[in-house]
């Protein structure tokens, strides 16, 4: 009996990439559904109509009620359209500049990640997963910018019962990038290449994602 072939690193990347990007986009759809007036205003009822509205409509009106609290002392959901980066960076620049800049940064980060991933050995699963997380997050936010010119953010963390002291609103794609970068930096055998990947990806998160 022939030995069982190990799961290809490219198959692992494809599986994680498709799954994580789908989760990111689905949670953004849920944010639009639960936190904006889009479907009420357009009368969309079926899933197909709502998905079409999610992809086609821009600059949506948030619901007028209080934000949805996951855990009231520290965590709530709040719909935000972020045309810039974290802490409002690049908001003052023109849309054409932002789109061009974020496109170049995102494509550069994706190219670097794939170049580094190609060099990994089949048994380096830890680094494969870390890079897959960063890649999925970068592409998830890039799809937002490509379709709308801004990133949909909705997760809002703040200091204990102090919503005025809060972290910039973010999304699942941002979380994937942060976790992936942390794994790269903390990996004891990652070496200088992984350190460089972490620094490059963190720069992409700040410059080309929503927070």
Swiss-Prot record:
Family matches, as InterPro entries: Peptidase_A8
GO cellular component term, pick one: plasma membrane
Pfam families per UniProt: Peptidase_A8
Highest taxon above the source species: Bacteria
Active-site residue numbers: 153, 174
Chief subcellular location: membrane
Catalysed reaction, written as an equation: Release of signal peptides from bacterial membrane prolipoproteins. Hydrolyzes -Xaa-Yaa-Zaa-|-(S,diacylglyceryl)Cys-, in which Xaa is hydrophobic (preferably Leu), and Yaa (Ala or Ser) and Zaa (Gly or Ala) have small, neutral side chains
Pathway assignment: Protein modification; lipoprotein biosynthesis (signal peptide cleavage)
EC number: 3.4.23.36
Function: This protein specifically catalyzes the removal of signal peptides from prolipoproteins.
Protein name (database record): Lipoprotein signal peptidase
Organism: Anaeromyxobacter sp. (strain Fw109-5)
Designated gene of the protein: lspA
């Amino acid at each position: 009996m022939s030995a069982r072939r190990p799961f290809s690193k490219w198959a692992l990347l494809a599986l994680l990439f498709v799954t994580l990007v789908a989760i990111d986009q689905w949670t953004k759809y849920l944010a639009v559904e639960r936190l904006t007036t889009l479907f009420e205003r357009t009368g969309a009822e079926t899933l197909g109509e709502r998905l079409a509205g999610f992809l086609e409509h821009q600059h949506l009106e948030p619901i007028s009620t209080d934000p949805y609290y996951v855990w009231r002392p520290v965590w709530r959901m709040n719909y935000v359209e972020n045309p810039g980066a974290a802490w409002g960076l690049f908001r003052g620049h023109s849309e054409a500049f932002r789109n061009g800049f974020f496109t170049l940064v995102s494509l550069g980060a994706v190219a670097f990640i794939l170049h580094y991933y190609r060099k990994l050995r089949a048994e380096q699963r830890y680094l494969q997963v870390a890079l897959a997380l960063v890649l999925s997050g970068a592409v998830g936010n890039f799809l937002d910018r490509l379709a709308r010119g801004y990133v949909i953010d909705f997760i809002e963390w703040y200091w204990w019962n102090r919503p005025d002291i809060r972290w910039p609103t973010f999304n699942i794609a941002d979380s994937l990038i942060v976790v992936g970068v942390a794994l790269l930096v903390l990996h004891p055998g990652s070496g200088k290449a992984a350190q460089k990947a972490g620094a490059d990806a963190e720069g992409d998160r700040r410059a080309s994602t929503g927070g």
